[in-house]
């Protein structure tokens, strides 16, 4: 009992302190009532006004709501429409001015059912695509269309690691990538026949660690696809096989419909843009060899703009490509994948892309796709079917067949 009494007294002794705290708390809460207490009134008179924010200052300095709704949709002139905007980025005291991505280069985030289905199939068969590895901005367009037969998939063969390190490309690099998957040709053909695509693009990483550069693996994949889906159109976007033209001929005779090899940029900028093992003249020889090996093939190449090239350099590149009998050329805007890669020298406007498209057609190219978001395989099926195959078949009265009988690797190498 003595212990409990002393404990009770200690609780009573602390009550005056707790009452003071409670009274103070109540007086603070009464600040919001219609009749504030004297202490609350004195506190409110000494409180300073909140500082105006930068956002509010900018908002008040801009047009009024009446101005916003009253001007209508006045069209912008080209200089206003293509004006680049900048922003200050970084911590206080170390901010840097960065050029914002132009509006004509912005694309939607992919989320369609077709996109999810293709991605699931690819992971299940352990296949890679350049669409994902190279962070292509058009993946929602190429994979997300409602019409499967018009969709385009770009399968990347021989793994996801390249032996070269071009300064514009985000694909992983290594001197010793993983060995080839012997089941990849069969898996690729199975996936493509399952999807019901009308057009497929096969590309690959460079494999300088292999004696043939992976050419036989490439050719075998084409043959498997043609066996499972004879009506599908196949485009092969290959490397230069270190200049081994016999390997180029092997792939060209494997049964494909389009042989593509990208020169990437003009000759003068090639040493700064591409890996040291690649050069412009070697790429020209690859395209010539493919055409000579199978004259019925469509040959195709692509150039990136915005790297610092001049008009004269572009003219020279196009002349050399036409001299090599290249049929199709595409122009697209270079977009820096990460801060480790080459910076963008210039954002080329859509009007300039249209100008170069007209120039290429005037020079005799069979077809030219040109635009900020155009990539070498962007909507390749649509462009090829509508602008190349149909044109050729109409000229020949519908009797021409593009492509050749698939053969074995042994037949090709004999």
UniProtKB/Swiss-Prot annotation:
Organism in which the protein naturally occurs: Aspergillus fumigatus (strain ATCC MYA-4609 / CBS 101355 / FGSC A1100 / Af293)
Domain Radical SAM core: 145-366
EC number of the protein: 2.8.1.8
Keyword 4Fe-4S carried by entry: yes
Binding site residues for [4Fe-4S] cluster 2: 162, 166, 169
Listed NCBIfam families: lipA (TIGR00510), PRK05481.1 (NF004019), PRK12928.1 (NF009544)
Subcellular localization, as worded in the UniProt entry: Mitochondrion
SUPFAM superfamilies: Radical SAM enzymes
Catalysed transformations (reactions): [[Fe-S] cluster scaffold protein carrying a second [4Fe-4S](2+) cluster] + N(6)-octanoyl-L-lysyl-[protein] + 2 oxidized [2Fe-2S]-[ferredoxin] + 2 S-adenosyl-L-methionine + 4 H(+) = [[Fe-S] cluster scaffold protein] + N(6)-[(R)-dihydrolipoyl]-L-lysyl-[protein] + 4 Fe(3+) + 2 hydrogen sulfide + 2 5'-deoxyadenosine + 2 L-methionine + 2 reduced [2Fe-2S]-[ferredoxin]
Enzyme category, top tier: transferase
Stored SMART domains: Elp3 (SM00729)
Family as reported in the entry's similarity comment: Belongs to the radical SAM superfamily. Lipoyl synthase family.
Keyword Manganese: no
Cofactor: [4Fe-4S] cluster
Entry-linked PROSITE patterns: RADICAL_SAM (PS51918)
Record GO cellular component, one term: mitochondrion
Composition-biased stretches (Low complexity): 32-48
Interval spanned by the transit peptide: 1-31
Annotated region (Disordered), positions in chain: 31-51
One GO BP: lipoate biosynthetic process
Descriptive protein name: Lipoyl synthase, mitochondrial
Functional pathway: Protein modification; protein lipoylation via endogenous pathway; protein N(6)-(lipoyl)lysine from octanoyl-[acyl-carrier-protein]: step 2/2
Main localisation: mitochondrion
Pfam families documented for this protein: LIAS_N, Radical_SAM
Binding-site residues for [4Fe-4S] cluster 1, renumbered to this chain: 131, 136, 142, 377
Cofactor note: Binds 2 [4Fe-4S] clusters per subunit. One cluster is coordinated with 3 cysteines and an exchangeable S-adenosyl-L-methionine.
Transmembrane segments: none
């Amino acid at each position: 009992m003595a212990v409990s009494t002393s404990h009770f007294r200690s609780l009573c002794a602390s009550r005056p302190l707790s009452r003071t705290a409670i009274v103070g708390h109540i007086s603070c809460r009464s600040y919001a009532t219609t009749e504030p207490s004297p202490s609350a009134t004195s506190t409110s008179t000494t409180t300073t006004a909140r500082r105006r924010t930068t956002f509010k200052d900018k908002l008040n300095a801009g047009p009024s709501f009446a101005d916003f709704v009253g001007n209508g949709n006045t069209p912008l002139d080209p200089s206003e429409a293509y004006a680049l905007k900048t922003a200050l980025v970084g911590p206080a005291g170390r901010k840097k001015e960065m050029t914002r991505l132009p509006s004509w280069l912005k694309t939607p985030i992919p989320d369609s059912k077709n996109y999810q289905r293709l991605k699931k199939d690819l992971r299940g068969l352990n296949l890679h695509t350049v669409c994902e590895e190279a962070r292509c901005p058009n993946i929602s367009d190429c994979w997300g269309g409602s019409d499967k037969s018009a969709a385009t998939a770009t399968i990347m063969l021989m793994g996801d690691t390249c032996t070269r390190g071009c300064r514009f490309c985000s694909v992983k690099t290594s001197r010793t990538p993983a060995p080839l998957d012997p089941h990849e040709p069969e898996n690729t053909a199975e996936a493509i026949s399952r999807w019901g695509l009308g057009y497929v693009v096969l590309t690959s990483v460079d494999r300088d660690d292999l004696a043939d550069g992976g050419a036989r693996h490439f050719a075998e994949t084409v043959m498997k696809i043609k066996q499972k889906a004879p009506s599908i159109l196949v485009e092969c976007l290959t490397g230069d096989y270190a200049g081994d033209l016999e390997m180029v001929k092997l792939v060209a005779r494997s049964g494909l419909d389009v042989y593509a090899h990208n020169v990437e940029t003009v000759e003068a900028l090639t040493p700064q843009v591409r890996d040291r093992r690649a050069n412009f003249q070697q790429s020209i020889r690859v395209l010539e060899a493919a055409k000579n090996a199978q004259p019925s093939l469509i040959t195709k190449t692509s150039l990136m703009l915005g790297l610092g090239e001049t008009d004269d350099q572009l003219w020279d590149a196009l002349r050399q490509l036409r001299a090599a009998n290249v049929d199709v050329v595409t122009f697209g805007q270079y977009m820096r994948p990460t801060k480790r890669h080459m910076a963008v020298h210039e954002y080329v406007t859509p009007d300039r892309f249209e100008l170069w498209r007209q120039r290429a057609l005037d020079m005799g190219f069979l077809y030219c796709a040109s635009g900020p978001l155009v990539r070498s395989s962007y909507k390749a099926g649509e462009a090829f079917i509508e602008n190349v195959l149909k044109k050729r078949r109409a000229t020949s009265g519908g009797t021409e067949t593009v492509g050749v009988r698939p053969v074995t690797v042994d037949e090709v190498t004999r």
